Amino acid sequence: ASREGLSCVQVGNSGGLLFASGLLDLLAVHPARSGAASLDPFAAHAALARDVPDHPLARVDGASIRDAFAAFVAALAGAGLRYAAPSERNCSVATSIGTIKTTYAVPRTMAAGADALASRPACLVVGIRGLREFSARQFVAAFGDRWPGLRHVEIDLPGTEAAAELYAAHVARDLEARAARDRTIALV
C-alpha cells in the first residue's frame, strides 16, 4: 500500500507472546477436512476457488498473489529482514517441539533448516544447557524415526555456565554478536 502512495496503519495483536515464527503462509491445506498439507499452494488455491468461490482468497488470482508476496518480501528485505525467495512450492520446517509446519516463505536464517528437513542428511542438533524453550534431546526423539543420522548434544553457552535457566530472548540477543556466535560454534 505504501508503495502505491496509500496511507498505511499497522494493526496488530498486543498479546503476551514475544516472538512470531517469521514464517509467511499462503495456503497449505485444502480441503480443510482432509488435514493433508499440500506442497503446491497454487493448486490448493485453484481448488479453493473452485470449491468455495466466495472465499476471500478465491477472489484473488494466482498472479496477483505471487506479485503481492514478491512485493512484501522485497519490503521486508528493505527493512533488513531477508527471506528466501518464494517459489511455486510450499516448504516444510521442523518446529522446536518436533512437528512439521508447512509454509510458503521462510527467513533466510531458516532456509538451511527447511532444506535439511527435505533431504534429511546426518545432522547434529545442538541444545543449550538451561534453555527453557528448546530441548535438542526432545527434538531428536520426535524426529529420530523419520530422520536417520539425527543426533544431539548439549553445550553451555559461553558466559552463562552459572545460570540455572536461560530464555530464548536473552540467548538470541547474545548470539547477535559475531564474537558470541564464534565462541559458541567453537564448542561444537
What spans do the regions from the language model cover?
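General beta-strand structural signal in soluble alpha/beta enzymes
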Residues: Q10-V11, Y83-A85, H152-E154
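Conserved N-terminal glycine-rich FAD pyrophosphate-binding loop of Rossmann-like flavoproteins
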Residues: G12-P53, T160-D174
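N-terminal Rossmann-like FAD-binding beta1-loop-alpha1 element of flavoenzymes
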Residues: A1-G12
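Predominantly flavin-linked oxidoreductase catalytic cores and closely associated redox partners
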Residues: L17, T103-V188
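Dinucleotide-binding Rossmann-like beta1-alpha1 core, especially the glycine-rich loop
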Residues: L26-R129, Q138-P148
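Small-side-chain structural scaffolding
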Residues: A1-S2, A28, A68, A186
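Active-site regions of enzymes building and remodeling cell-envelope glycoconjugates
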Residues: C8, L24-D25, G149-L150
